């Protein structure tokens, strides 16, 4: 008997053009951090490198630790520690604006709601590369 349904979020329940989302997300992030001395290209390259470090992470450390260790190699430990709150602020306040690059899928929302009404447990899976907010 099926008791639970697992859905992939990005690109399945949440329609998105990965390139469009990435460009929009980086534009927002770069605009937030430019006043603090972050040149956009270097910042974007460093975030990509941090993302690669998370993907390669074997579980020996958290993805967050993997990301910040790689970030520190470019910007240094002192600047990284000092500026972490800027990133937290970005994800708490500005990141929501990136939702324009992932439009709502009403059919997906209806499907999930119907499955829940029918008593199924519904789980959403995604790659945890963004911080929890």
Residue ranges and their predicted role:
Residues 44-92:
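A metal-dependent, Asp-based hydrolase signature
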Residues 86-103, 108-133:
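Substrate-recognition element of Asp-dependent hydrolases with the DxDx(T/V) motif
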Residues 24-28, 70, 110:
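Alpha-helical elements of Rossmann-like donor-binding domains used by nucleotide-donor carbohydrate transfer enzymes
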Residues 1-7, 12-46:
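Active-site neighborhood of HAD-like aspartate-dependent phosphohydrolases
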Residues 16-17, 55, 97-99:
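Short, contiguous strand/loop micro-motifs
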Residues 37, 76, 116-119:
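Glycine-centered loop/turn motif at secondary-structure junctions
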Residues 19-22, 61, 101:
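Flexible, glycine- and charge-enriched loops at secondary-structure boundaries
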């Amino acid at each position: 008997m099926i008791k639970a349904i697992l859905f992939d979020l990005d690109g399945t329940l949440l329609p998105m053009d990965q390139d469009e989302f990435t460009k929009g997300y980086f534009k927002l992030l770069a605009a937030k951090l430019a006043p603090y001395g972050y040149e956009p290209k270097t910042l974007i390259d460093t975030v990509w490198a941090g993302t690669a470090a998370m993907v390669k992470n074997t579980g020996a450390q958290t993805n967050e630790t993997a990301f910040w260790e790689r970030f520190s190699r470019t910007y240094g430990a002192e600047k990284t520690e000092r500026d972490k709150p800027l990133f937290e602020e970005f994800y708490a306040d500005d990141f929501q604006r990136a939702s324009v690059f992932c439009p709502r899928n009403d059919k997906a929302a209806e499907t999930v709601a119907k499955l829940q009404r029918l008593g199924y447990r519904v789980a959403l899976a995604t790659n945890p590369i963004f911080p929890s907010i």
